Each structure stands twice: as structure tokens, then as C-alpha cells.
Amino acid sequence: MAEITAQQVKELREKTGAGMMDCKRALTENAGDITKAIEWLRQKGITSAEKKASRVAAEGMIGSYIHTGSRIGVLVEVNCETDFVARREEFKKLVNDVAMQIAACPNVEYVKVADIPAEIAAKEKEIEMGRDDLANKPDNIKEKIVAGRIEKRLKELSLLDQPFIRDQNISIDELLKQAIAALGENIQVRRFQRFVLGEGIEKEETDFAAEVAAQMGQKAPEPVAAAPQVEEKAPEPAAKDNPPAKGKKKK
């Protein structure tokens, strides 16, 4: 059996966020292989999450994130089972990561696919069924293609199906499951709201010069009329000088 070092345990914890004992066990089960240990922990995390999913999660915190420039803001509620876990730095970091994820995903509108209203799915199906590239396809093939496209579209609207911005190899759903395995409690994203500065406001088109003049109590300057163009005439050729008259010779 390969000896598991503290450095290996630390590396695995940094990559997965799992607890120290879980990391040590994962490495032991996989002969010190980091990659296999990560897969083992993911499987364990999924199992742990399924077992804890039915538990009531009424504690937690409401996290916020304001993007640089103060043009995008996010509020998100993430729940756990006890306020002991809610106070832990690992949980606070998770909430902040989820808030940043929402800020980075303008198309995301729902926590999970199951939250998306049926009428939206029906509208997507109507759009896809009418596409020209499916016009000559057999009905059974068309249905399969449309189902795949709808599934992809609905996942684009779902937060839990987004690739995690800090690690594209996992989704937000997997991130939560890793946190469940590490913290030992059911953790759920309940709701969120994304704010964009000026969103939904129709901006009035204004004449900038007139606006400045109005603020200064002056009349807006009249536009300068273009000067009329004068057609230039070609210069007339100069008249030839008449030869001087010959004088009479004196006798």
C-alpha cells in the first residue's frame, strides 16, 4: 500500500474542497493517484448529496456581489441546515462564488431546469419545429433533434447546469455536491436576482448641443448653412496685340 503524505492530502483538499479525512481516504483507496482520488470524491459527493437532499435547509445566508464599475449586481440566497455551517468560511466562499457565477451569466434566469415554466419549454419547441433545416426530416428524427436542442436551451437558462467559472470541468451543481460532501450538510441555492444598471429603461434621444444650451439658459445655435457654390468660369484667352502701324518715311 502506497504511503499517503500530508502534501498529497493538502493538494487534494485544494483541488476539491473536501475534508481532510475524506481526502486521505480517497488517496488510500486509489493508491495515492490524485486524478482517481478526485473522481472517487465526486462519486462520494454525489452519493452524499442524494442522501442529504431531503433534509430541511433553512439556515444559510444571502450573499451579494457588485461587479467592477457598479453596473451589475447580484443577490443570492443559499441555504444550509445549521448556522454553524453558515458561519464557516468555506460556506461563505461558496456563496460568493455562486454570486459571481450569476453575475457572469446574463442568460441564466432559473436555479434549475425543473424551475422553468412549461410554457417556455413549449415555446422553444414551437420555434425549433419551425426551423428550415428540419423541414425535410422524418418526424421521428425531427423529434429527437428538437428534444436535444430544447434540452440544451433550457440548460442555458439554468444556474446549476452552468460550467463553474473557476473550474470549467465541473458544473455549479457539482460544486454544490462537493460542498455538501465537505461540510456534511444539505446545501441548496434557493433564489437569486441579477441587476443590470439601466436595464428596461428607454433612453430618450436628445440633441447634445441643445441640451447644453438649455442648461446654460441660452438658445441652441442654429445649424450653419452651407455656403452656395459659385461656378467658376474658365478664363478667356488673352487678345493678341495688334502690330504697331508703320510710320511714313521723311523725304
From Swiss-Prot:
Residues 215-251 are annotated as: Disordered. Keywords: Cytoplasm, Elongation factor, Protein biosynthesis. InterPro entries: EF-Ts_dimer_sf (IPR036402), Transl_elong_EFTs/EF1B (IPR001816), Transl_elong_EFTs/EF1B_dimer (IPR014039), Transl_elong_Ts_CS (IPR018101), UBA-like_sf (IPR009060). Residues 82-85 are annotated as: Involved in Mg(2+) ion dislocation from EF-Tu. GO terms for molecular function: translation elongation factor activity. Residues 219-229 have a biased composition (Low complexity). One of its GO terms (cellular component) is cytoplasm. It is found in: Cytoplasm. Coiled coil: none annotated. Its main location: cytoplasm. Residues 230-239 have a biased composition (Basic and acidic residues). It comes from the Bacteria. Associates with the EF-Tu.GDP complex and induces the exchange of GDP to GTP. It remains bound to the aminoacyl-tRNA.EF-Tu.GTP complex up to the GTP hydrolysis stage on the ribosome. NCBIfam families: tsf. Belongs to the EF-Ts family. This is Elongation factor Ts. It comes from Microcystis aeruginosa (strain NIES-843 / IAM M-2473). The lineage of its organism: Bacteria, Bacillati, Cyanobacteriota, Cyanophyceae, Oscillatoriophycideae.
